[in-house]
UniProtKB/Swiss-Prot annotation:
Name the UniProt record assigns to this protein: AAA-ATPase At1g43910
Record's GO cellular component terms: endoplasmic reticulum; Golgi apparatus; membrane; plasmodesma
Molecular function as annotated in GO: ATP binding; ATP hydrolysis activity
Catalysed conversion reaction: ATP + H2O = ADP + phosphate + H(+)
Expression induction: Accumulates in shoots and roots upon potassium-starvation.
Highest rank taxon of the organism: Eukaryota
Record's keyword terms, sorted: ATP-binding, Hydrolase, Magnesium, Membrane, Nucleotide-binding, Phosphoprotein, Transmembrane, Transmembrane helix
GO biological process, one term: cellular response to potassium ion starvation
EC number: 3.6.1.-
InterPro entries: AAA+_ATPase, AAA_N_dom, ATPase_AAA_core, Mitochondrial_chaperone_BCS1, P-loop_NTPase
Class of the enzyme per the UniProt entry, highest EC level: hydrolase
Chain intervals with Acidic residues compositional bias: 457-467
Length: 475
């Protein structure tokens, strides 16, 4: 018995061993934190968890990353849309809530997906656990986001064949009934699209355009939305391109809003002049969601910038030493090329994603590069023209709530004689809620434009006469 007790270590020996072990552990932990980068530590920890889980657990985990083969992972997107419906009964100490409704700060906040929190779902009696993870990165995107979906190993095939299909269909149904559309702008500093609630109330009902144009456009949009099988059968990407052109103030932006509200599509508003190069353009455009509108306004400005860059490049190439090709290449990597843009309009990259509408707007169609106007490049060219008698009456009905007035006939005659945009007419109609006052002001405005037009014509004719007399005197 004494021999047995003599083999038991003393308390001081145990405490000394514990102290030494703690010191070694603290030293090792300090070395890891100071020397090994955070990303590598997270990677090692993740691999260790995966390794031990595969041997000692009966669970199986699907990893669903945000990006997949250069584009947004549609399974990740479906999970983002679907999982908030599973949050109502979530038993956790935290819940992500928020609202982007700027016009109604008192609106009820919506539920978001919290990071590193388990979300429970059940599918045909199968227990599923979702977790959203986020890891910082120094690449194009400031963070890497991915979901873990965990289930029992025996249900792996069932989840692959049935659950993910159910997930996609559920997300599509939710998106088709969503309350708010969003408009996105690209934040270069954070390398990501940022959104705001899109609450433009223009619809095809309130849009003041000629009825034939309206009907043609609505029919075209409806056919496009139902044309998945058709586009697949003819081997074309499921997309549609519209070129809106015409003078400023003719309603191009309102037309875009009406299209978005009719189709229930989000809008991605891209300022193309700010894109650094074709590589960034590819990254930006492939990150847009399906069932969306890519809007590039004033495309002629982007074309002008492209031509200026090409001209400058030729001048610089001619004056630089041939022995510094790398320096020349680096100098001109800023700015996109027209070919890079066209690749996404109808080139190979146009097949990335589906059910997308591309809209270009311009005030000067004649300034566009001919490559943008070739047949098949933009499917529909829509002239947004000056105000017509029909558009005038539509605007009066909207703003003054009247369908007839004694001033209608003289104003319609003036509209046919003088070029005026719908924006100019609207501005005059909004000057007063009284129809008599507003229409009288519009008539005076058009009369003044007519007089000015006559004066300008007289000055121009006098100038031509003087030029002719000068030439005759010289001869």
């Amino acid at each position: 018995m004494a021999t047995l007790y003599s083999q038991v270590p003393s308390v001081s020996a145990v405490f000394s061993l514990y102290t030494s072990f703690s010191a070694i552990t603290m030293l090792f932990r300090t070395i890891l934190n100071e020397i090994v980068p955070k990303r590598i530590r997270e990677y090692i920890a993740m691999k260790a968890v995966d390794f031990f889980s595969s041997y000692f657990q009966s669970d199986f985990t699907f990893v669903i990353e945000q990006r997949w083969e250069f584009v947004e992972n549609q399974t990740f997107r479906a999970a983002e849309v679907y999982l908030p419906t599973c949050l109502a009964g979530l038993s956790t100490g935290k819940l992500l809530v928020g609202s982007s409704n700027l016009k109604n700060p008192a609106a009820e906040p919506k539920l978001g997906i919290p990071v590193n929190t388990k979300i429970i779902d059940n599918f045909e009696g199968i227990h599923l656990e979702w977790t959203l993870h986020s890891v910082e990165t120094k690449k194009y995107l400031p963070e890497k986001r991915y979901f873990h979906l965990t289930c029992k190993k025996e249900f792996r095939e069932k989840i692959m064949t049935d659950y993910f299909t159910y997930l996609a269909k559920s997300a599509e149904k939710i998106m088709s009934h969503r309350e708010n559309l969003k408009i996105y702008t690209y934040n270069q500093d954070r390398s990501k699209w940022e959104s705001a609630i899109f609450e433009h109330h223009t619809t095809f009902e309130t849009l003041a355009v000629e009825p034939d144009l309206k009907k043609t456009l609505i029919d075209d949009l409806d056919a496009f939305s139902k044309g998945k099988d058709f586009f697949k059968s003819v081997g074309r990407a499921w997309k549609r391109g519209y070129l809106l052109y015409g003078p400023p103030g003719t309603g191009k932006s309102s037309m875009v809003a009406a299209i978005a509200n009719h189709m229930k599509y989000h809008i991605y508003d891209l300022q193309i002049q700010s894109v650094r190069d074709d590589g960034e353009l590819r990254e930006i455009l492939t990150s847009t969601k399906n069932r969306s509108i890519l809007l590039i306004e004033d495309i002629d400005c982007g074309a002008d910038a492209s031509r200026r860059r090409q001209s400058k490049k030729k001048e610089e190439d001619g004056g630089e030493d041939d022995g510094e090709p790398q320096k020349r290449k680096k100098k001109f990597e800023v700015g996109i090329s027209l070919s890079g843009l066209l690749n996404f309009v109808d080139g190979l990259w146009s097949s990335c994603g589906e059910e997308k509408i591309i809209i270009f707007t311009t005030n000067h169609k004649e300034k566009l590069d001919p490559a943008l106007l070739r047949p098949g490049r933009m499917d529909v060219h829509i002239l947004m023209d000056n105000c017509t008698p029909f558009v005038f009456k539509k605007l009066v009905a909207l703003y003054l709530k009247t369908d007839e007035h004694v001033l209608f006939d003289p104003i319609e005659k003036l509209i046919l004689e003088v070029s005026s945009t719908p924006a100019e007419v609207t501005q005059q109609l909004m000057a007063s809620k009284n129809a008599d006052i507003a229409l009288k002001g519009l008539a005076e405005f058009l009369e003044n434009k007519k007089l000015k037009k006559g004066e300008d014509s007289s000055v121009e004719e006098e100038g031509e006469i003087e030029d002719a007399e000068t030439k005759e005197a010289e001869t």
